[in-house]
Amino acid sequence: MFDIGVGELTLIAVVALVVLGPERLPKAARFAGLWVRRARMQWDSVKQELERELEAEELKRSLQDVQASLREAEDQLRNKQQQVEQGARALHDDVSRDIDIRASATPVATPLELAHADWSASPDVDTAAGATDAAGAAHTAPVIAQAQPIAPAPHQTLVPAPHDAIVPAPHAAHLASAPEPVAVVPVDAGTPAASMPSAPAKIQEKQP
């Protein structure tokens, strides 16, 4: 504390012993020790206070550094905010200018022109609506199968066979020598062959 060595302490003790004597030396030693102890305590307290003050100063310095960095960051944020606001204002001005230019370039239709356009467009709308309705009706109408009428068969003209002449018996030899008459009957394509009577059969039936 006081930078006193061992030799110096020995010298002080010898001087005190000579000056004070052996009777007063113990009291003087206790008194000196008490004052030395108080001086150390006082020095320790001062030292602690100095250390506390130094720590406080360091804390203050660190706090000031932090505050300075925060201020710098705040200034940077403000600058960026101002730049963003300026860019937004410039963009808004450009957009509003373009809108004004387009609005001035686009002709404004008068009410008479609008009415004329609506009147000219109404027949087209009606025609389109009629075509749409017709197409819908064609799609929804049911398909009805109609039977075709059957044409009647052509009437067949029946020609009666000629009356066979009844010849008496005495003239049988003359009939035998004479050629037999052949009855010509018109034959229709649709008449079956079984329905046509033959002339010889009728002659034989009518002979007695």
From Swiss-Prot:
Species this chain originates from: Xanthomonas axonopodis pv. citri (strain 306)
GO CC annotations on file: TAT protein transport complex
Protein name, as recorded: Sec-independent protein translocase protein TatB
NCBIfam families, alphabetized: PRK04654.1, tatB
Entry keyword RNA-binding: no
UniProt keyword annotations, A-Z: Cell inner membrane, Cell membrane, Membrane, Protein transport, Translocation, Transmembrane, Transmembrane helix, Transport
Function of the protein: Part of the twin-arginine translocation (Tat) system that transports large folded proteins containing a characteristic twin-arginine motif in their signal peptide across membranes. Together with TatC, TatB is part of a receptor directly interacting with Tat signal peptides. TatB may form an oligomeric binding site that transiently accommodates folded Tat precursor proteins before their translocation.
PANTHER family: SEC-INDEPENDENT PROTEIN TRANSLOCASE PROTEIN TATA, CHLOROPLASTIC
GO-annotated molecular function: protein transmembrane transporter activity
Main localization (coarse): membrane
Pfam families: TatA_B_E
UniProt family annotation: Belongs to the TatB family.
Subunit structure: The Tat system comprises two distinct complexes: a TatABC complex, containing multiple copies of TatA, TatB and TatC subunits, and a separate TatA complex, containing only TatA subunits. Substrates initially bind to the TatABC complex, which probably triggers association of the separate TatA complex to form the active translocon.
Source species taxonomy: Bacteria, Pseudomonadati, Pseudomonadota, Gammaproteobacteria, Lysobacterales
Region annotation Disordered: where it falls in the sequence: 188-208
GO biological process: protein transport by the Tat complex
HAMAP family: TatB (MF_00237)
Chain ranges passing through the membrane: 1-21
Compartments reported by the entry: Cell inner membrane
Topology versus the membrane: Single-pass membrane protein
